[in-house]
């Protein structure tokens, strides 16, 4: 019976395996475009959008999709593509650059990073120098604690490299103190020996066996003492070697030679100036600073001088041009006689005589006045530059007159006073007439009193022969009296010429 039950169970399991298991999955993922059927897990997987790549074979959702970046780029925490760093020479790659993790670079073994950078190091440094020993080991980011070696594990002086290291590092810190009961003669040998050692090879130190006459004390083994004092004792005067002999001068292991080498090294270290770079203080060369300061002062001074000189010259030129302009503007213009065209005004020929009222006799006929030249440009008779014909002396009627003084033209308009002669039978009335002078012409000798003068009357009898000639330079009206022929007792006739 039990065997029958077992066979039935196996048959049932075989029937279950015969049914297809992917049929319901296909129907479930077929209508959803964001999922697709997975082959490995036999279920629906999430379809990542374009530009994103799945982080696992069958992503379950958007969390399993990441941005697809170019090679040597990774997706940072913000979901952006970021370039991976490149390991510089002297660095090693600790982690490679992948799609979701950056590349990490670190210093080589035996060095630590003293200037860190993002996923890298900008400057690496050795943990300990050659003369130091490791006290506490460090890592790529933490420095190793180093210390100086102890006196027991000091360098071997028999090695030439160690001797050079000892000479270059230990000698400047040693402060030798000479203690000796020797007299002045023994001390005077020291500079002589130092002078002789300049010619020898002073780079090698020779071990001197300890003796009762020469003892060299070792430096203090205390590492906390930064400055070590070396105390040297000179031998007694009796035990000093004779340096005058050739045998003693050739001994390389003599006490005086060793002492002189130490003193020579100490003297050279004391006389050598300390470099400012070794002490860590900033060094400023005053040469370029002084040069640039001098250049700035020179440029400022020359610029100020040129600016002041330019302003002074400009002011001087402006004053000069202003004066020249004033002189050209107000310069008096000389009027010449022949500068304007002349017009000859002909007077009508009139023949007549004047009868003297007191005697009743006829006087000589009056000759007409000469022709008058007028200035067409001005508009008034310009007679001030024309000589009078009847004014020449009797001896020489053709002798020229002196040229009249030129008139200065102004821009004002003044009233010109001229005398008018009115002839009657027994009286002559003398008065004044106001005339306008054109612009640019100023009458000579005119005053305000003459402009405001009233009419004056003179009752003295005058005749045509006694008339005064018109003044020089008068371009205004000229009036005189004539008597026409055939008429008696006729009033005065006025002839005006303009």
From Swiss-Prot:
Modification type Phosphoserine: residues: 339, 353
Induction: By concanavalin A and pokeweed mitogen in splenocytes.
Source organism of the structure: Mus musculus
Disulfide bond entries: 69-81, 84-97, 87-105, 107-121, 128-146
Pfam families xref list: TNFR_c6
Region (Disordered) location: 142-168, 204-256, 338-370, 389-411, 436-498
Signal peptide as annotated in the record: 1-18
Sequence ranges on the Extracellular membrane side: 19-287
Gene3D superfamilies: Tumor Necrosis Factor Receptor, subunit A, domain 2
InterPro entries reported for this sequence: TNFR/NGFR_Cys_rich_reg (IPR001368), TNFR_8 (IPR020416), TNFR_superfamily_member_8 (IPR052862), TNFRSF8_N (IPR034002)
Record's function text: Receptor for TNFSF8/CD30L. May play a role in the regulation of cellular growth and transformation of activated lymphoblasts. Regulates gene expression through activation of NF-kappa-B.
Protein name according to UniProt: Tumor necrosis factor receptor superfamily member 8
Superkingdom of source: Eukaryota
Gene Ontology CC: one annotated term: plasma membrane
GO biological process: signal transduction
The TNFR-Cys repeat ranges on this chain: 68-105, 106-146
Positions with biased composition (Basic and acidic residues): 402-411, 456-465, 484-498
Record's subcellular location: Cell membrane
Residues bearing carbohydrate: 156, 183, 229
Alphabetical UniProt keywords: Cell membrane, Disulfide bond, Glycoprotein, Membrane, Phosphoprotein, Receptor, Repeat, Signal, Transmembrane, Transmembrane helix
SUBUNIT field: Interacts with TRAF1, TRAF2, TRAF3 and TRAF5.
Chief subcellular location: membrane
Biased composition (Polar residues): 242-256, 338-358
Cytoplasmic side: 309-498
Family: Belongs to the TNFR8 family.
Tissue expression remark: Detected in thymus and in activated splenocytes.
């Amino acid at each position: 019976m039990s065997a029958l039950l077992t066979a039935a169970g196996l048959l049932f399991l075989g029937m279950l395996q015969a049914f297809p298991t992917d049929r319901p999955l296909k129907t479930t993922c077929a209508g959803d475009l964001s999922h697709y059927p997975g082959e490995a897990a036999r279920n629906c997987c999430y379809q990542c959008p374009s530009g994103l790549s799945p982080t696992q074979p069958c992503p379950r959702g958007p969390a399993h999709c990441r941005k697809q970046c170019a090679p040597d780029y990774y997706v940072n925490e913000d979901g952006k593509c970021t370039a991976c760093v490149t390991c510089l020479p002297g660095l090693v790659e600790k982690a490679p650059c992948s799609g979701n993790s950056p590349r990490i670079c670190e210093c080589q073994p035996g060095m630590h990073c003293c200037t860190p950078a993002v996923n890298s190091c900008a400057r690496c440094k050795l943990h300990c120098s050659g003369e130091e020993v490791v006290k506490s080991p460090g890592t790529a980011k933490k420095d190793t604690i180093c210390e100086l070696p102890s006196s027991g594990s000091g360098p071997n002086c028999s090695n030439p490299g160690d001797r050079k290291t000892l000479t270059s590092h230990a000698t400047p810190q040693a402060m030798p103190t000479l203690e000796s009961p020797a007299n002045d003669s023994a001390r005077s040998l020291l500079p002589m020996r130092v002078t002789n050692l300049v010619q020898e090879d002073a780079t090698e130190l020779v071990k001197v066996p300890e003796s009762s006459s020469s003892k060299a004390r070792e430096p203090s083994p205390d590492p906390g003492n930064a400055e070590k004092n070396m105390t040297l004792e000179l031998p007694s005067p009796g035990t000093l070697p004779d340096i005058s002999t050739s045998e003693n001068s050739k001994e390389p292991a003599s006490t005086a030679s060793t002492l002189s080498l130490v003193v020579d090294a100490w003297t050279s270290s004391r006389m050598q100036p300390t470099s400012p770079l070794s002490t860590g203080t900033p060094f400023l060369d005053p040469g370029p600073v002084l040069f640039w300061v001098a250049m700035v002062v020179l440029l400022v001074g020359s610029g100020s001088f040129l600016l002041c000189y330019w302003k002074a010259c400009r002011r001087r030129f402006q004053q000069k041009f202003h004066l020249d302009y004033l002189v050209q503007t107000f310069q008096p213009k000389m009027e010449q006689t022949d500068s304007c065209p002349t017009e000859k005004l002909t007077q009508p020929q009139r023949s007549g005589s004047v009868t003297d009222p007191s005697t009743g006799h006829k006087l000589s006929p009056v000759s007409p006045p000469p022709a008058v030249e007028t200035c067409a440009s001005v508009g008034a008779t310009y007679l001030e530059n024309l000589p009078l014909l009847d004014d020449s002396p009797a001896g020489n009627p053709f002798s020229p007159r002196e040229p009249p003084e030129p008139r200065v033209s102004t821009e004002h308009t003044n009233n010109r006073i001229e005398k008018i002669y009115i002839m009657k039978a027994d009286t002559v009335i003398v008065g004044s007439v106001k005339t306008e002078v054109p612009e640019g012409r100023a009458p000579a000798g005119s005053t305000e009193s003459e402009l405001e003068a009233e009419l004056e009357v003179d009752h003295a009898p005058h005749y045509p022969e006694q008339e005064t000639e018109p003044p020089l330079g008068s371009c205004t009206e000229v009036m005189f009296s004539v008597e026409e022929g055939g008429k008696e007792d006729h009033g005065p006739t006025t002839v005006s010429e303009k």
